[in-house]
Curated annotation (Swiss-Prot):
Keywords: ATP-binding, Hydrolase, Leucine-rich repeat, NAD, Nucleotide-binding, Plant defense, Repeat
Lineage, uppermost ranks: Eukaryota, Viridiplantae, Streptophyta, Embryophyta, Tracheophyta
UniProt source species: Arabidopsis thaliana (Mouse-ear cress)
EC number(s) from the headed UniProt entry: 3.2.2.6
Gene Ontology molecular-function annotations: ADP binding; ATP binding; NAD+ nucleosidase activity, cyclic ADP-ribose generating; nucleotide binding
Domain TIR: 10-178
Subunit structure comment from the entry: Interacts with RSH1.
Signal peptide: none
SUPFAM superfamilies per the UniProt record, alphabetical: L domain-like, P-loop containing nucleoside triphosphate hydrolases, Toll/Interleukin receptor TIR domain, Winged helix' DNA-binding domain
Chemical reaction(s) catalysed: NAD(+) + H2O = ADP-D-ribose + nicotinamide + H(+)
Notes on the domains: The TIR domain mediates NAD(+) hydrolase (NADase) activity. Self-association of TIR domains is required for NADase activity.
Taxonomic superkingdom: Eukaryota
Gene3D superfamilies on file: Helical domain of apoptotic protease-activating factors (1.10.8.430), P-loop containing nucleotide triphosphate hydrolases (3.40.50.300), Ribonuclease Inhibitor (3.80.10.10), Toll/interleukin-1 receptor homology (TIR) domain (3.40.50.10140)
Catalytic machinery residues: E85
Name assigned to this protein: Disease resistance protein RPP5
Length: 1449
């Protein structure tokens, strides 16, 4: 078959090329009729006059057809018209990918292909006659077309049954080739995978009539998949119908069935007036017809029986597809071929959501987390994804965030409407079970829920209707949207009164009902999810909280309080089946509680001293869990607990005995008594069904006389067992796991025991154990741990039968001398022999071991030759293997991973080894190794580690054969002097030569390298790296001999990180390059570097600490992506361009201890248009401290959480006045600089760390209040407490807010008093009120001040005009200007001159409280909207948190 046709509009489905004399009235007419019957549009020539050249309309028809059918017949080659058509078809086949079907009608395909025989004679005659009338090369084009088209697989009448059969086959083939997916389904993500899977079940090539079911939960997309499938298959089935079942009511069953049959036949036969008067017409009319029937949303078995009773009702090749949510309908109708529609994967679900919400396959970067959460809230259900996505379409991020609480807590109405249909179809009892699972038991074990609900049928019904799923490990899984549906249905019944619901699952509702005692008889279950156990609010339960809940059956809560809970209850509902109360404060259950219906009693970590008095009717009780109830002194009488299956008393420290009545619990299977100091275990002698016993205590008394253990024990856990040996009557036939660690056992038992089920044996730390029992019958043993069995001398040879052994730990068996030989442990994955100093032979074992730890403290290990055979496993790790040399018979041809770290010899082996399987080799720490082995045949090696091989001088040239090598590490190879030249390791991405202190030159050994580490080497210059165009990271730290970088570094346009820390010889960097991808540049400690680096304007993180740079130049404004600039301890730095304040992205700038800084070149334009984005973070003088703090991983991308922003000029004592003023006016984020006096324009000031301000009315008309604060901090004195950050606490209208700014520990690096500035805002409540400020840090705050700020609504031009018209008196150099202060006018900040503004109000004295009366006192300065966006909000704090602290002073 030819390649598929190119996309685009086509006028015709089929173009036929034929000889009219041979086939027009016979074969062709039949074929056109068959194609027309399948609605296939075929070109018909309608008597176009034929000549030697084909007509233009024919050329157009050929090109606009999707398929050409070429009918080769006896006289086809007699027509130049036909041959020229064929040339055009051949061209479309090659150029347009048109599909071509050749048909050989009474001719031999080989004669056509080779132009021989009768066909060849006709062709040659045509060529001879027309040679003068056709172009010279026309014959060659005819020959090529005949040869190529005849070579395509087609239909041959001579080899077929008959002409009719061939017509049908060709028409079907054409139909299949024309099938394309309907564009209506293009937006349904993943639908093609479903369709292909269903097609494989349908087996369309089969002639039998077949019924197939499509099954899945509501909203999963079954109907959509069905419609898409129907659309694709329709062209193959002229007789077809798609019917959706509609529920009907009424008693006329016969009429309903006749109506169904009429609808089906009308759809299939296309007749609207069909009359049906009796049943069975469907079978009669369609018995011999090939049909496609799809029945959707089937919820009635009679519907199926009436329309598609049996597959035999329909003709050969028919396909019946039934879509339903109920698996039982399919079973009842004997439909065994079922396709289950499952939830899409996380990736597909996200794509579905994004198609609906964003119209594309992935979310915008800033919507990723929200999109993931919405997809999760939809439970990956296609219906939910589509509905939620549509509801969020074309909404901004803020709107998404505002809608999230509603999506988390509720259920969309459209989703609920669709899912509710499934619930409404359930019988009442099944509806009750659905609600019970949705509200209480989603995610629980099936057996657990069956016991509580006493229903084995209901769960099966819900599962068959796709309302729940039973997981492979036996848990109930209900989709989260169905769970929300159930809870919404229950909530709706109560009409707003939680006490009248059936189930309570929300803390607030439970709190209300329990605290206010509003529970009613309707309430069946209370369950608080575990995540709400730790609510900050206590659940106040008193003695009568449960008194109104007469019918409560399920109670699962926890204790959240810090005290005040009752130690006793008056009443517990008598119908309780589940009592699950962790940390219960009760000392005992109420005496009125009878426990008659109780199935599960779970009271872990309780304060119980006893459960109840006397004997209660416990016939329903199956599980009792009192884990870690440390005050429990006795277990109640269990005489009536004949159905008890599990009893957990682990950690009940006060319990001393088990009641003799426990022997009546004949169904007890699990008993946990670890940590219980029992007097004796004789009461266990009647426990014939006990399978799980956990004792785990060394102080069990009366154990020496034990003569009986339950015979069906599967798991015995008895750590610290005081017995010397188990009794001879101990039965191990059913034993699966034996754990007796740190026991006093000397031996387990005598003789051979039937250990066929035993899988685990843990005897670790049994220091008296002298021998391991016979394990010859332990053929399923998988794990053995006898670590620290110090008395063990030999290991049993019977271990050889443990062919499934995976884990064997014999470490620290100090007396172990020998190990059995000839063990066949092919499954072994872990073997530990460390700490066995007397072991004189290594086990000669065949094994598939992936991890071997060898004995320590020996100079030589004798290894049997058979160990080193071709079965040597991949991943073998010879860690700390102190061999002198590898065994002479070592054959590593199957070795995948070779780790021989700390190898002691000078070479690994002699000659060339076959290493074709080797992928990783580690010879690190082999200090004596002078050469690595010949690796010329290790062509699959990907990772080679030679770290700390100090004697290694060079690498062999054969390393050039390692074309798959991805990573080469040679760190601290101090003897390495040269690398081989003229090699190109084409796959090498990481090369680490750091610490190779003798390496002076670096030849480029790979053009594919991405990470290159050359730090701490003796390299003097970097050679041409222009060919390393993939390089992303270049690390040259501590290359002290390096003076510069080559200009060819400009070719490295993928370089993202360049680290040159402490390259003390580096003087200059190239200036004529721009590394477009460079994000991190670290030149810290380059003490000879005098000029600001200009090798990239895209730098994000720039480290220039301890350099000799003298100026931050004006071109800093071009660094538009810069976020971090560290220049502390730059003693030669004198000038900083004010253009640094233009960088909106800059978040950190630190000039601490730049004591030579004199000024920041003032520029009135810069000040007037300032867009505050400049901030900094404080750092210490210690460079290493900075590295640790900012880098996380040494060479990461630097994408850190920058947290607090900060602009630091600490200890910059030479800053002139203009520079200080410019810095202060430019920042509304934290700033630090030397100083001991708050600027006078801070209108509210006070001594100490707090002040109270009465706000002017004009400020309360703002939506938000904005403040700038200033503190004077004495770094040499201690404050009133320890704080990690400098904190602002703010009280307003009875509420408290808080914000943390710079890290407090940075203050210790200040040498004198410093000023700290910060800005913040919060939402105004439009109420005139006092506000309180309190500032906290670990050092003494001498003085504090605040001022109000306002956001201007004017343009920059209007602001400047307004400024020029205002009149005020201002001191600025020698000029004076006057401004009137009246009414609500606000003085705009006009740059540097405004800093010296003298308010006519006077300065006054600072005090602990400031109240400035009068509207004129609202004078302050304007900020732009852009500046306001950078000001952080204060965070609200919980009631009392700050107030209590504030009052404590």
């Amino acid at each position: 078959m030819a390649a598929s046709s190119s996309s685009g509009r086509r006028r015709y489905d089929v173009f036929p090329s034929f000889s009219g004399v041979d086939v027009r009235k016979t074969f062709l007419s039949h074929l056109i009729e068959a194609l027309d019957g399948k609605s296939i549009n075929t070109f018909i020539d309608h008597g176009i006059e034929r000549s030697r050249t084909i007509a233009p309309e024919l050329i157009s028809a050929i090109r606009e057809a999707r398929i050409s059918i070429v009918i080769f017949s006896k006289n086809y080659a007699s027509s130049t018209w036909c041959l020229n058509e064929l040339v055009e078809i051949h061209k479309c086949f090659n150029d347009l990918g048109q599909m071509v079907i050749p048909v050989f009608y009474d001719v031999d395909p080989s004669e056509v292909r080779k132009q021989t025989g009768e066909f060849g004679k006709v062709f040659e005659k045509t060529c001879e006659v027309s040679k003068d009338k056709q172009p010279g090369d026309q014959k060659q084009r005819w020959v090529q077309a005949l040869t190529d088209i005849a070579n395509i697989a087609g239909e041959d009448l001579l080899n077929g049954p008959n002409e009719a059969h061939m017509v049908e086959k060709i028409s079907n083939d054409v139909s299949n080739k024309l099938i394309t997916r309907s564009k209506c389904f293009d937006d349904f993500v993943g639908i093609e995978a479903h369709i292909e899977a269903i097609k494989s079940v349908l087996c369309l090539e089969s002639k039998e009539a077949r019924m197939v079911g499509i099954w899945g939960q509501s909203g999963i997309g079954k109907s959509t998949i069905g419609r898409a499938l129907f659309s694709q298959l329709s062209i193959q089935f002229p007789l077809r119908a798609f019917l959706t079942y509609k529920s009907t009511s009424g008693s006329d069953v016969s009429g309903m069935k006749l109506s169904w049959e009429k609808e089906l036949l009308s759809e299939i036969l296309g007749q609207k007036d069909i009359k049906i008067e009796h049943f069975g017409v469907v079978e009669q009319r369609l018995k011999h017809k090939k049909v496609l029937i799809l029945l959707d949303d089937v919820d009635n078995l009679e519907f199926l029986k009436t329309l598609v009773g049996k597959a035999e009702w329909f003709g050969s090749g028919s396909r019946i597809i039934v879509i339903t949510q109920d698996r039982q309908f399919l079973k009842a109708h004997d439909i065994d071929l079922v396709y289950e529609v499952k939830l899409p994967s996380q990736g597909l679900a996200l794509t579905m959501l994004c198609r609906s919400a964003f119209g594309k396959d992935s979310p915008p970067d800033d919507f990723k987390e929200l999109a993931f959460e919405v997809a999760k809230l939809a439970g990956h259900l296609p219906l939910g994804l589509n509905v939620l996505g549509s509801s969020l379409r074309r909404r901004g991020k803020k709107e998404w965030m505002e809608m999230m609480p509603r999506l988390r807590n509720g259920l969309n109405g459209d989703i609920m409407k669709t899912l509710r249909v499934s619930y409404d179809r359930l019988h009442q009892k099944d509806q009750d079970m659905f609600l019970c699972i949705a509200c209480l038991f989603n995610g629980f074990e099936v057996s657990y829920v069956k016991d509580l609900l006493e229903d084995n049928v209901g769960l099966t019904m819900l599962s068959e209707k796709s309302l729940i799923r039973i997981t492979p490990d036996g848990h109930i899984e209900m989709h989260n949207l169905l769970e929300k549906l159930g809870r919404e249905i229950d909530r709706a019944k109560s009409k707003g009164n939680p006490g009248k619901r059936q189930f309570l699952t929300n803390f607030e509702d439970i709190h209300e009902v329990v605290t206010e005692k509003t529970g009613t008889e309707t309430l069946l279950g209370i369950r608080l999810p575990f995540e709400e156990y730790f609510s900050t609010r206590p659940l106040l339960i008193d003695k009568e909280s449960f008194k109104g809940m007469r019918n409560l059956q399920y109670l699962k809560i926890g204790d959240w309080s810090d005290g005040g809970q009752p130690q006793s209850l008056v009443y517990l509902p008598l119908k309780l089946r589940l009592l699950d109360w962790d940390d219960c404060p009760l000392k005992s259950l109420p005496s009125t509680f009878k426990a008659e219906y109780l199935v599960n009693l779970i009271m872990k970590y309780s304060k119980l001293e006893k459960l109840w008095e006397g004997t209660l009717p416990l016939g329903s009780l199956k599980k009792m869990n009192l884990l870690c109830s440390k005050n429990l002194k006795e277990i109640p009488d269990l005489s009536n607990a004949r159905n008890l299956e599990e009893l957990d008393l682990e950690g009940c420290e006060s319990l001393v005995t088990l009641p003799s009545s426990i022997q009546n619990a004949i169904k007890l299977r699990k008993l946990h008594c670890s940590g219980v100091i029992l007097i004796d275990l004789k009461s266990l002698e009647g426990m014939c069904n006990l399978e799980y016993l956990s004792v785990d205590c060394s102080r069990v008394e009366g154990t020496q006389g034990i003569v009986y253990f339950p015979s069906k024990l599967r798991l015995l856990l008895w750590n610290n067992c005081p017995l010397k040996r188990l009794h001879s009557n101990f039965k191990v036939e059913y034993l699966v796991k034996l754990r007796m660690e740190n026991s006093d056992l000397e031996k387990l038992w005598d003789g051979t025991q039937p250990l066929g089920r035993l899988k685990q044996m843990f005897l670790r730390g049994s220091k008296y154990l002298k021998e391991i029992p016979d394990l010859s019958l332990a053929i399923n043993l998988e794990e053995v741990d006898i670590c620290k069995c110090e008395s063990l001398v030999t290991f049993p040879s019977s271990m050889q039968n443990a062919i499934k052994l995976i884990y064997l730990d014999i470490s620290d068996c100090k007396k172990l001398e020998s190990f059995p030989t000839d063990l066949n442990l092919e499954s072994l994955e872990y073997l530990n022999l460390t700490g066995c100093p007397n072991l004189r032979n290594f086990p000669a074992i065949k094994m598939g071991c992936s991890d071997v730890d060898f004995p320590e403290g020996r100079n030589e290990i004798v290894v049997e030759d058979c160990f080193w055979n071709k079965n040597l496993p991949a991943g073998l790790d010879y860690l700390d293997c102190l061999m002198r040399c590898m065994p002479c018979e070592f054959r590593p041809e199957y070795l995948v991973f070779l780790n021989v770290r700390c190898y002691k010899h000078e070479k690994l082996w002699e000659g060339i080894q076959s290493l074709g399987s080797l992928e990783e080799m580690d010879l690190s720490e082999s200090e004596n190794l002078t050469e690595i082995p010949d690796l010329s045949k290790a062509t699959n090696l990907k990772h080679l580690y030679l770290n700390n091989c100090k004697s290694l001088v060079t690498l062999p040239s054969t390393i050039g054969n390692l074309q798959k090598l991805v990573r080469l590490e040679m760190k601290e190879c101090t003897g390495l002097e040269v690398l081989p030249t003229d090699v190109n390791l084409s796959s090498l991405e990481t090369l680490d030569l750091s610490g190779c202190s003798s390496l002076r030159t670096f030849p480029l050994i790979s053009k594919s390298i991405k990470w290159l580490y050359l730090e701490n080497t003796a390299i003097e210059e970097i050679l041409d790296l222009s060919k390393a165009t993939k390089l992303e990271s270049l690390i040259l730290n501590n290359c002290k001999s390096l003076v510069t970088l080559p200009s060819t570094i400009g070719n490295l346009q993928n370089l993202r990180r360049l680290y040159m820390k402490r390259c003390t010889g580096l003087e200059v960097l190239p200036t004529d390059v721009n590394l477009s991808s460079l994000g991190i540049l670290d030149l810290s400690g380059c003490s000879s570097l005098r000029t600001f680096p200009l090798i990239s304007t895209n730098i994000v993180w720039l480290y220039l600490e301890n350099t000799a740079i003298g100026e931050v130049p004006c071109c800093i404004e071009d660094f538009t992506r810069l976020r971090v600039l560290l220049m502390y301890c730059c003693q030669r730095l004198k000038n900083i361009s004010p253009n640094i304040f233009r960088l909106r992205s800059l978040m950190f700038a630190d000039f601490t201890d730049c004591r030579g800084v004199i000024k920041a070149l003032s520029d009135a334009t810069v000040v007037a248009t300032m867009e505050d984005s400049v901030s900094c973070v404080p750092l210490s003088e210690n460079i290493e401290y900075t590295c640790e703090r900012f880098w996380g991983e040494l060479y990461g991308d630097g994408d850190w959480d920058l947290g607090t922003e900060y602009f630091s000029f600490r200890n910059c004592f030479k800053l002139d006045r203009d520079a200080r003023e410019l810095i202060l006016r430019s920042c509304f984020k934290p700033v630090a600089l030397p100083g001991g006096e708050i600027p006078k324009y801070f209108t509210y000031r006070a001594y100490g760390d707090s002040l109270t301000v009465t706000l002017p009315r004009s400020s309360l008309s703002q939506s938000f209040l904005r403040f700038k604060a200033c503190l004077v901090v004495d770094p040499l004195s201690e404050g009133k407490g320890f704080y990690r950050y400098l904190e602002v606490n703010f009280g307003f209208n009875g509420k408290q807010y808080q914000k943390s700014f710079l890290e407090d520990e940075e203050l210790e690096f200040c040498k004198t008093d410093h000023l700290f500035f910060c800005s913040f805002k919060f939402e105004s409540e439009m109420t005139f009120n006092d506000v309180e400020f309190k500032f906290c840090c670990s050092n003494r705050i001498k003085e504090c001040g605040v001022r109000l700020m306002y956001v201007s609504q004017e343009t920059e031009y209007n602001q400047q005009t307004t400024r020029s018209k205002k009149r005020m008196r201002m001191t600025s150099g020698t000029s004076e200007e006057y401004i009137n202060l009246a009414g609500d006018q606000i003085v705009a900040d006009t740059g540097l001159a405004a800093l010296n503004m003298e308010l006519s109000l006077g300065e006054g004295e600072a005090s602990s409280s400031t109240s400035l009366e009068g509207e004129a006192l609202s004078v302050d300065y304007m900020i732009t909207k852009e500046q306001d966006e950078d000001i952080p909000f204060l965070d609200p704090v919980s009631d009392g948190t700050w107030r209590s602290f504030y009052s404590a002073e």
